From Swiss-Prot:
Role played: Involved in pseudohyphal growth, cell wall metabolism and required for the separation of the mother and daughter cells.
Low complexity bias: start-end ranges: 85-126, 144-236
UniProt main location, coarse: secreted
Domain of life: Eukaryota
Phylogenetic lineage: Eukaryota, Fungi, Dikarya, Ascomycota, Saccharomycotina
Ranges for region Disordered: 85-246
Protein name (Swiss-Prot/TrEMBL): Protein DSE2
Any one Gene Ontology BP term: septum digestion after cytokinesis
GO CC annotations on file: cellular bud scar; extracellular region; side of membrane
Topology of this chain in the membrane: Lipid-anchor; GPI-anchor
Compartment(s) of residence: Secreted, Cell wall; Membrane
Propeptide: 277-294
Signal peptide segment: 1-22
Record's keyword terms, sorted: Cell wall, Cell wall biogenesis/degradation, Glycoprotein, GPI-anchor, Lipoprotein, Membrane, Secreted, Signal
Length: 294
C-alpha cells in the first residue's frame, strides 16, 4: 500500500513538472508579443495584438446657392404701396464616400469661389408691363455681397422702357428718369445725390451713378403699407421704420425720403405721375470646400 502511494506521488510530481515545463516553453515562445504594463508598482504581463481600422475617405463639394430678392415700391402723390416680393434660388451639391486602407489622415479646409454660377434671373415689372432682366453674369465675381439698385420713374401716359443697369464689383446705384414724361409741358424733375456725384433735370432724362457700399435707402417691405390721406402745408409719416416728410408749395405735394449715406428726392407735380423704385439685392456667399483624403 505504501509502494502504491509513493508511486502515485512520483507520478503526480512528474506530471506537474511536465506541465510547468510546457507552460514555460509556451511563454518563452510568446515573448516577442509580450508587452509589460506597470501600474502602481505592479507589473502586469499581457500578450497584446493590435489592429487599426482606417476611417473612410469623404470628399464633399458644395456650391452655395445665390438668392436674388426683388422688392418693388410705388410712390404716388397720395399713397405708398409695396408690391410682390420675388425670391429665386438654386443650389448644387454632391458628396461621395470611399473606403481607404491607410491609417494616416490628412484633412484640409480651403475657401474658394464656386467654379460655376447658379443660374438665377429675375425681372422687374413696371407700370407699362415691360420687363427688364436683371443681369447675372457677375454673381460670383467677388466674395462680398453686391448690391445693385434700380430706380425707374415713369408716367402712366408713357410707354418707354426705363430700367437698365449691370452689376459691378463695387455696388452701383443708378437713378433713371424716363426720356419722355408727359411731353405736353409737365414738370417732372428728380435729383439724386451722394458723397460723390449728383444730378437733376426738369422734363428730361436724369441719371446719377455713384459707387457705394450700401444699398439705396428706399422703403423696403413686403407686408406693410402706409397711405397719405392729405397733403397739408407740412406733415410727415413713417414707413418701414423710416420717416418721410411732406411739404406743399404752390399746389404741389413734395415727398422726401433720405438716410445718412444716400438720399434721392423726387418731385411729383402732376396727379397722374408716380415713381417706381426697385431695389435688387444680390448676395453671393463664399463656397467652403472640405476635402478629407486618407
Amino acid at each position: 500500500m505504501q509502494f502504491r502511494a509513493a508511486t502515485l506521488l512520483v507520478f503526480i510530481f512528474q506530471f506537474l513538472n511536465i506541465f510547468i515545463e510546457a507552460n514555460q516553453q509556451i511563454q518563452k515562445r510568446d515573448d516577442d508579443n509580450v508587452r509589460y504594463i506597470t501600474s502602481d508598482g505592479v507589473v502586469y504581463k499581457y500578450a497584446i495584438k493590435t489592429s487599426t481600422l482606417a476611417p473612410a475617405s469623404v470628399v464633399v463639394y458644395t456650391r452655395y446657392y445665390t438668392t436674388t430678392i426683388v422688392r418693388e415700391i410705388t410712390l404716388a402723390n397720395n399713397e405708398v404701396t409695396t408690391t410682390t416680393e420675388e425670391i429665386t434660388s438654386a443650389s448644387v451639391s454632391s458628396a461621395s464616400v470611399t473606403p481607404s486602407a491607410s491609417s494616416s489622415s490628412v484633412s484640409e479646409t480651403t475657401t474658394s469661389k464656386s467654379e460655376s454660377a447658379a443660374s438665377v434671373s429675375s425681372s422687374i415689372s413696371s407700370n407699362n408691363d415691360e420687363e427688364s432682366e436683371i443681369p447675372d453674369q457677375s454673381f460670383l465675381d467677388n466674395d462680398s455681397s453686391s448690391v445693385s439698385s434700380y430706380i425707374s420713374s415713369m408716367s402712366p401716359e408713357t410707354s418707354s422702357s426705363t430700367s437698365s443697369s449691370s452689376t459691378m464689383h463695387n455696388s452701383t446705384v443708378s437713378s433713371f428718369m424716363p426720356s419722355s414724361v408727359d411731353n405736353s409741358g409737365s414738370d417732372f424733375s428728380s435729383s439724386s445725390s451722394s458723397s460723390s456725384s449728383s444730378s437733376s433735370s426738369s422734363s428730361s432724362s436724369s441719371r446719377s451713378s455713384s459707387s457705394m457700399s450700401s444699398s439705396i435707402s428706399m422703403p423696403i417691405s413686403s407686408s406693410s403699407s402706409s397711405s397719405i390721406s392729405s397733403c397739408s402745408s407740412s406733415s410727415s409719416f413713417d414707413f418701414d421704420n423710416k420717416s418721410y416728410s411732406i411739404s406743399k408749395s404752390d399746389g404741389t405735394c413734395y415727398v422726401y425720403y433720405e438716410d445718412d449715406e444716400y438720399y434721392s428726392t423726387v418731385y411729383l407735380t402732376k396727379p397722374g405721375q408716380s415713381v417706381d423704385a426697385a431695389t435688387t439685392i444680390k448676395s453671393t456667399k463664399t463656397v467652403y470646400k472640405t476635402v478629407s483624403a486618407n
